[in-house]
């Protein structure tokens, strides 16, 4: 049986190549997302996925080495789709610092509202890795744009290294915020505000940071409504 050598073909090519083989892979990933959202990860099996995707058993192993691998691909696609929509939402925004903070709220919103959140919280390292691979390049681009636009003062392009290093800590802290939302301790915006004021997203004066946060808290975003079945989450009155 022919087996695809994943080492020879980039992941991006696997995802977007228009062919029968890539379509089968897409169907399997969609099936995995559907299953994870409805059943969680514990009972996922190859048999169940190929039935949902309506593909042959061997097709699974042409694309994935294990169930764990397709779980990562499923989360990868979910985050990538979110990022595409997020970039469209802010395409006309000129305040790049605002975009960096808004992305933090969007990440909390995405995870807190996904039906898969409980199994995702069991594998936080996987979540961190996916966000690092998918969203980090976009956040670095926004950071550089903010520096070039002088929206981050007294900063040079070389400080991007420090930003990269701090993002890892921020991602772990964001997972803690998601857990607080899931446990009912805070609303998404309350968790976001607490996190954004206590962990450095970017090195800017508190006054500038607080103004950006206040703007975000006052706004209502399309994905807030969509992800909460049409119910808006009230901003933190403080």
Predicted region positions:
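Amphipathic alpha-helical segments used for helix-helix packing
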Residues: 105-130, 144, 179
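C-terminal peripheral helix-coil segments that are non-catalytic and often amphipathic
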Residues: 1-11, 148-149, 179, 183-238
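Hydrophobic alpha-helical connector segments
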Residues: 73, 87-114
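Basic, helix-initiating cap at the start of DNA-binding domains
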Residues: 1-48, 52
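Short hydrophobic/aromatic patch on the recognition helix
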Residues: 53-64
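An amphipathic alpha-helix adjacent to DNA-recognition modules
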Residues: 22-30, 42-43, 62-87, 105
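Amphipathic alpha-helical packing segments from all-alpha helical-bundle domains
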Residues: 87, 127-178
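Short, hydrophobic secondary-structure boundary micro-motifs
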Residues: 45, 117-122, 155-156, 160, ...
